[in-house]
From Swiss-Prot:
Gene3D superfamilies: 1.50.10.10. It is an enzyme of class 3 (hydrolase). This is Endoglucanase. Belongs to the glycosyl hydrolase 8 (cellulase D) family. It catalyses: Endohydrolysis of (1->4)-beta-D-glucosidic linkages in cellulose, lichenin and cereal beta-D-glucans. One Trp residue has been proved to be involved in the mechanism of action of endo-K. It comes from Bacillus sp. (strain KSM-330). Transmembrane segments: none annotated. Residues 1-27 form the signal peptide. Residues 28-55 form a propeptide.
Length: 463
């Protein structure tokens, strides 16, 4: 039997990153659907088989979209064109360093290369489901700048499906390795699957679903038969993977991708997702009221009910699983996006508290942010890294008093190059800060009817 995958770590060049893991007032958004940028052709060193390049659909939301979300700041000390160019340049470098399609065991399959630690079960790991999710979101949002974006995206999806989970085949196993035997060998990690499913909704809005891949159908299938069936717990929480117990309270806040979950509701009509969102916000509030009332920080892992920090060395992850470390550092971006895209006021309350604390802590200087804090705000780390800095900058976008903070943070972020984990999350945050992470809006005629299926039936592999 395959050993159940707990949590694995991403070894960064600078620091260690840990991977994978209501009703609202809609925020007004202004889309620029008419701006079409010249495509950027993929580096020839990345494409190894030109026959894999196929006809692609015209982008419906080409980069740059430069959306202006109501109540959300952008860096305003430079032009929108400058912001867009910084994203393009960062993406070009990211793609050259991390985007690969050299799998001899899966021709045409793309993956995002990232070093890991953990237990790859004797395989040589090249990437993860976490990286796959990051890459799929980034690629679909950069379509229009990158003329090969759909080919790349479809290749990333090919890999995600080939490396299906050993438990629920509608999800992705957490390891990518250049070995046929690795396909279907590993169980899942919740965060990677959430990003992958969400990216499919973006792909549906970017290219439509009438081509060789029905993105909408694949997304709805993954959302309902994969994530809902295996990751949503009986208490409306999110477990750590399809190996996790459905009765557990063990969860990882970096998996609490509120705007993803709200999109899942909009594209399926299943109110389960609203219940999950409400539960996660309540868990966050109850946790911070007791353990971090001054900072608003949350720990890498949360356990039990009422919620409390996981013990140190939880799941043999790190000695800081009870603190704001390389998992929790990603949380502020996931929270603020719910306010930006859907007007969720609970997201603003959390973002405002975190931003107020970190600005005070650093005296308004983003370069003074360090890589790790105890819940009371005491330093654990000693240097800034983008996977901490950029989400803290994103949290500051909800209040006009933070304009200088956002501007300074942008200047720090835009040229910061470190490693797969930090660079990927930095790029995702740059897309948000510049208005180039747009909201997927469903076609009402194609909303899936809510389906409540038995978990066992969902886990049967489809022919």
């Amino acid at each position: 039997m395959v050993e159940k995958r707990k949590i694995f770590t991403v070894l960064c060049a600078c620091g260690i990153g840990f991977t994978s893991y209501t009703s609202c007032i809609s925020a007004a958004a202004i889309d620029n659907d008419t701006l079409i940028n010249n495509g950027h052709k993929i580096n020839s060193s990345i494409i190894t088989n030109s026959s894999q390049v196929s006809a692609v659909a015209k982008e419906m939301k080409p980069f740059p979209q430069q959306v202006n979300y109501s109540g959300i700041l952008k860096p305003n000390h430079v032009s929108q064109e400058s912001l867009n160019n910084a994203v393009k340049n960062y993406y070009n470098d990211w793609k050259k360093k991390y985007l690969k399609n050299d799998l001899s065991s899966l021709p045409g399959g793309y993956y995002v290369k990232g070093e890991i630690t953990g237990n790859p079960d004797g395989f040589r790991p090249l990437g993860t489901s976490e990286g796959q999710g990051y890459g799929m979101i980034i690629t679909v949002l950069m379509a229009g700048h990158d003329s090969n974006a759909q080919t790349i995206y479809d290749g990333l999806f090919k890999t995600a499906r080939a490396f299906k989970s050993s438990i629920n085949p509608n999800l992705m196993g957490w390891v990518v390795a250049d070995d046929k035997k690795a396909q279907g060998h590993f169980d899942s990690a919740t965060d990677g699957d959430l990003d992958i499913a969400y990216s499919l909704l973006l792909a549906h809005k970017q290219w439509g679903s009438s081509g060789k891949i029905n993105y909408l159908k694949e997304a709805q299938n993954m959302i309902t038969k994969g994530i809902k069936a295996s990751n949503v717990t009986k208490n409306n929480g999110l477990n750590l993977g399809d190996w996790g117990d459905k009765s557990t309270f063990d969860t990882r806040p970096s998996d609490w991708m509120m705007s993803h979950l709200r999109a899942f509701y909009e594209f399926t009509g299943d109110k389960t997702w609203l219940n999950v969102i409400d539960n996660l916000y309540n868990t966050y509030t109850n946790f911070t009221n007791k353990y971090s009332p001054k900072t608003g920080l949350i720990s890498d892992f949360v356990v039990k009910n009422p919620p409390q920090p996981a013990p140190k060395d939880f799941l043999d992850e790190s000695k800081y699983t009870d603190s704001y470390y390389y998992n929790a550092s990603r949380v502020p971006l996931r929270i603020v996006m719910d306010y930006a895209m859907y007007g969720e006021k609970r997201g603003k309350v959390i973002s405002d508290k975190v931003a107020t604390w970190i600005k005070s802590k650093t005296k308004g200087n983003p370069s003074k942010i360090v890589d790790g804090y105890k819940l009371d705000g005491t330093n654990i780390g000693d240097y800034p890294t983008a996977v901490y800095v950029s989400p803290f900058i994103a949290a500051g976008t909800t209040n006009s008093k933070n304009q200088e903070w956002v501007n300074s943070g942008w200047d720090w972020m835009k040229n910061k190059k470190e490693s797969y984990f930090s660079d990927s999350y930095n790029l995702l945050t740059m897309l948000f800060l510049t208005g180039n992470w747009w909201k997927p809006i469903p076609d009402e005629k194609k909303i899936q009817s809510p389906i409540n299926l038995e978990v066992q039936s969902e886990l049967k592999e489809q022919d």
